[in-house]
């Protein structure tokens, strides 16, 4: 399980990316790369990393559900994810 500080850092980065998204797009369209460099580092969407919403795990992230593969398996086995069931053929 990830430290609370790591989870908080990712949330903070996501807020910064959202805050500067319009300004970043406008500067990029103008080709004003000097002004683009003056924006905060964490305002770049490249610095975001998907994390499990429950555990904060950075690897094995499933975009469709927003959780890691481990949490997905546990929740699917318990029947907590609608429309997901164990395959059998």
UniProtKB/Swiss-Prot annotation:
NCBIfam families: PRK08881.1
Pfam families registered for this protein in UniProt: Ribosomal_S14 (PF00253)
Gene Ontology MF annotations: rRNA binding; structural constituent of ribosome
Known partners and oligomeric status: Part of the 30S ribosomal subunit. Contacts proteins S3 and S10.
Swiss-Prot/TrEMBL keywords: Ribonucleoprotein, Ribosomal protein, RNA-binding, rRNA-binding
Protein name stated in the entry: Small ribosomal subunit protein uS14
Function per UniProt: Binds 16S rRNA, required for the assembly of 30S particles and may also be responsible for determining the conformation of the 16S rRNA at the A site.
Gene3D superfamilies reported in the protein's UniProt record: 30s Ribosomal Protein S14, Chain N
An annotated GO cellular component: small ribosomal subunit
Disulfide bonds, paired cysteine numbers: none
Name of the encoding gene: rpsN
Keyword Transmembrane helix listed: no
PROSITE patterns, per the entry: RIBOSOMAL_S14
Protein family according to the UniProt entry: Belongs to the universal ribosomal protein uS14 family.
GO biological process, one term: translation
